[in-house]
Amino acid sequence: MKKTRYLKKNYDRSAAILFAVLIIGTVFGAIFFKKLPDISGLKLMKHTVFGSFSDNFPSIALIMLTLFISGFSAITQPLEISALFAYGVSLSVKISGVYTLYGWRGFLFTLFSIIPFAMANSFFLMLAGREALKLSGSLTGFVFSGDGNEKTEPKLYMLKFCILSGLIIVCEVLASLVSYLCQGILKI
C-alpha cells in the first residue's frame, strides 16, 4: 500500500516537472520570437487541410519518436525532458508568428484552431514523457544498482505509445480541419 502511494506521488511529481518544462519552453519561445530581427519572410501556413497537417505533424511525430526510443535507454532522461522543452518553444514561436502577422484575426485563429489542440497534444506528450521517464528510470535502477523495477513491461510501454500516437494523429487531423475552416472564415 505504501509503495503504491509512493509511486503515485512520484508520478504526480514527474507530471508537474514535465508541465513546468513545457511552460518554460513556451516562455523561452516567446522571448526568442521577440528577439528575431525580421519576420517579414515568415510564411504562416498553406491554405489546405493537408498543408496544415504536413506543417504540424512531422515535428510532433519526431518528438514522439524521440520520447519512445529514449525510454529504452538508461541515460536519456535529459533528452526526454528536452523534447518537451522543444515542443514548448516551437508552439510559442508559432503562436507569436500568427499574432504578429495577422493581428486580431490571428488572435481569433489561435484561440479557436491552435490553442485547444496544442493543449491536447501537450497533455499527450506529457503522458508519453512520463512513461519514457518511468521506463528509463527503471532501466537506470537496474543498470546502476541491479534492483530496477522487475515489472517493467516493454509491450505495455509500446501499447501506451501506440495509443498516444493515435490520439495525437486524430488531434492533428482535427486541428488541420479546424484550421482550414478558420482560415476561410477569418480570411487569413
Task: Report each predicted region and the residues it spans.
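Cytosolic juxtamembrane amphipathic/interface segments immediately preceding
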Residues: 1-12, 67-68, 147-155
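Conserved mixed alpha/beta catalytic, RNA-binding, or beta-rich assembly cores of soluble enzyme
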Residues: 75-103
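Interfacial loop-to-transmembrane junctions
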Residues: 142-165
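Interfacial/capping segments of alpha-helical transmembrane domains
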Residues: 31-49
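Interfacial helix-start motif at the membrane-water boundary
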Residues: 48-76
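Final/C-terminal transmembrane alpha-helix of multipass membrane proteins
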Residues: 157-181
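Alpha-helical transmembrane segments of helical membrane proteins, especially in multi-pass transport
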Residues: 113-137, 168
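N-terminal signal-anchor transmembrane alpha helix
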Residues: 5-36
